[in-house]
Every structure is written in C-alpha cells, then in structure tokens.
Amino acid sequence: MKIVSTKTELEAVLAPWRAADDSIAFVPTMGNLHAGHLHLVDTAKTKARRVVVSIFVNPTQFGPDEDLAAYPRTPEQDIERLRAHQADLLYLPDAADVYPDDGQPATFVEVPGLSEQLCGKFRPGHFRGVATVVCKLLNRVRPDLALFGEKDFQQLTVIRKMVRDLDMAVTIMGVPTVREPSGLAMSSRNAYLSPEQKERASLIFRTLNQAAEAVRAGERDYARIEQEASATLEAGGFSVDYVSIRRQQDLAAPSADDSALVILAAAHLGRARLIDNVLISLDTTR
C-alpha cells in the first residue's frame, strides 16, 4: 500500500492508474478505523481494480463546542488495518494540504434544505463542511465509485444530491451499517462510551426496529411512533435530539403512497452523540 500526504503526491500515484484505465473506488474516512470502515474497503475491493482510502479529520464539519480536539486519532493502527485489507493507496493529508488558505476553505459547497434538518438542525454548518471536503476529495481522487456507510444516512443523502446537482462523474454507493453483536452501530465515537453505556447504547437500534415494525404492520400515525420511540430512549437514559420517519429518497416527510422509508435518530449518552437509522420497505400492492 502506498501512502501519500499531499495533493501532488496523490496525483503522481493516480495518474498512471488512470492512464492504464484502472477502475478506482474511493473510501473517505476520518480515521480511527473500525470494522465498519474496513467493510467499506472490502466492498470497494470487489467493485474496482484500485482502492483509495483517505484519512482526514475535517475541521470544517465540527462546531465550535464539538469534539474536534478529542476526536480519536489512531494513524499507526489505521495503516496496519488498511494494509491487512489490501487497500492500494492511503491519502493522509493535513488541513494545510486540503485547505491551502490557512487551513480553512475560501469556497464552500452547500446543499440547502437537506443540510438544515435532522442532524443539521442540531449541528449548524456541519453538512456544509461535509459537502465541501467530500467535493474536494472527489475532485482530487476522481474515482469511478465512492463508498459511504448507511449509518450516516443524512450525510449519504446530502452527498448524493451534491453529486447529482453538480454533475460529478462518480457513482455514490451506500453500504449497510456494520453493527456490534448487541446491535449498536459501529462508530468511532463509541470510544467515548463506558462499558456500561456501550451496553445501554444498543437501545437505539432496538427502539428503531420496534418503530419500524409498527410501520410495517400498518401503523401510519408517524408522529405517535416518533414520540413513543423518543420516550423509550429518554427513559433509557438518553437525551434525544430527534426520532424521525422520512422518505429515503430525499428525507422529505412521507406521504401515504411512499414505500421506501427510513426512521432516523440522534441521541446523547454521556459524552457520545449517537446516530442510527433503520430502512423500511413497504409492500404498497396489498
């Protein structure tokens, strides 16, 4: 596996691959790699001749009171794991390489509407930072395919819309969430949880599954389902930002004839802000 840290070095490795018409899959990450990230890499290996991974803790997607300084950074461990999973190239830039203007972007990419709701309501500017850095990384790597975990479903939806609206020549692939045996979605922020909190955190997935089952069984009072799920989480010790049932395609409020739904949640447990979702496919022919 090659490791580069600058845009110039990245281009020097990618140019011969492009000249040879090698297909390229890209997995952007913020590091502290866990089994969910590595599943993205393994999936990428089945989709393309070359797999590029980036590790960059992007400062522009963190708010002023968020965990940028505390976010877990494990570069040596990450490199070992990527080698074991046979990634071809690791791009490991610093802020000055990604944002040459004093480590901050002078130009931003924003996806209005999608970016201000759900997590965007509680993390103002977050998705502007995400869209900007992902746009820059996609322009630098120019992959055929970029892979993102479905755990961050709103992020995935924002990126898909950005790529579509800007006519970017890349396919965006969502990959199902990898979970702990308890059902807890794997996340770098799980490191903030104590063993007891980690056990309790699986309540999010169980609660979302129960809500999804109610929808599949025919319940259509979505507001009541959301309220009951929120109450369950609050009773379990969480501070809930939201539980919301939306249309998968664009995260709009669902109508009666929508069959592809998603129920999303964000809640705090101790120091950790946890997000999760469950996809719902309804049989509208019945």
From Swiss-Prot:
Pfam families: Pantoate_ligase. Pathway: Cofactor biosynthesis; (R)-pantothenate biosynthesis; (R)-pantothenate from (R)-pantoate and beta-alanine: step 1/1. It catalyses: (R)-pantoate + beta-alanine + ATP = (R)-pantothenate + AMP + diphosphate + H(+). GO terms for biological process: pantothenate biosynthetic process. ATP binds at residues 30-37, 149-152, 178, 186-189. Beta-alanine binds at residue 61. Transmembrane segments: none annotated. Its EC number is 6.3.2.1. The active site is at 37 (proton donor). Its main location: cytoplasm. Keywords: ATP-binding, Cytoplasm, Ligase, Nucleotide-binding, Pantothenate biosynthesis. One of its GO terms (molecular function) is pantoate-beta-alanine ligase activity. It is found in: Cytoplasm. The keyword Ligase applies. NCBIfam families: cyt_tran_rel, panC. Homodimer. Catalyzes the condensation of pantoate with beta-alanine in an ATP-dependent reaction via a pantoyl-adenylate intermediate. This is Pantothenate synthetase. The lineage of its organism: Bacteria, Pseudomonadati, Pseudomonadota, Gammaproteobacteria, Methylococcales. The gene is panC.
